[in-house]
Amino acid sequence: ENDMKLVDGSYLTMEDSSEGSTDSNPMLRGEHLMDGNSGISKAGIGRIYAYGATTADHDVDFIAVIVYVDRYNEETGKWGQIATWTVEDENTYYVSSGKVVLVERGYYYRVHCDHFAGNKADPMYDQDFSFTNGIFIP
């Protein structure tokens, strides 16, 4: 039996790290987007390492990952965004980005990512998302 709290798809854990991928989502990926990954890990006192990557199954005109860092707010019972950044590239099949983020201690944090891949001729880019569980930063 799992006593861990589940908030918007993410468990609140005492783990040192967590990873997520688009595999866990039933959304259609479309014809270009193959996989998306997100990751979070402890990186020292009051620091986390946040990571996101998008993989297409062939070279595409445009590929991107938007990485969001969320902190759990016990009062609202919701995740709140504290950091975000975007990395994009052209004429390739893979893009990734990772950063060390300074965070307040005593909270749970997670990473979620939006993943995009497509060609300019497409009416819309393929899009999916991934997210990690929450890890506690003491």
Locations of regions flagged by a protein language model:
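N-terminal prepro-regions of secreted/extracellular proteins
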Residues: E1-S41
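Short, surface-exposed binding/anchoring microloops in extracellular/periplasmic proteins
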Residues: G30-V69
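Extracellular Ig-like/FN3 beta-sandwich strand-entry sites
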Residues: I45-R47, F62, E104-H112
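Beta-strand elements of well-folded, non-transmembrane domains
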Residues: T54-H58, V69-N73, L102, A117-N119
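Solvent-exposed serine/threonine-rich low-complexity stretches and specific carbohydrate-binding patches
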Residues: V67-Y68, K78-T92
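Exposed aromatic-hydrophobic patches
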Residues: Y93-V103
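Enriched for extracellular/lumenal, surface-exposed ectodomains of secreted and cell-surface proteins
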Residues: Y108, H112-D122
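Short beta-strand elements
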Residues: K120-P138
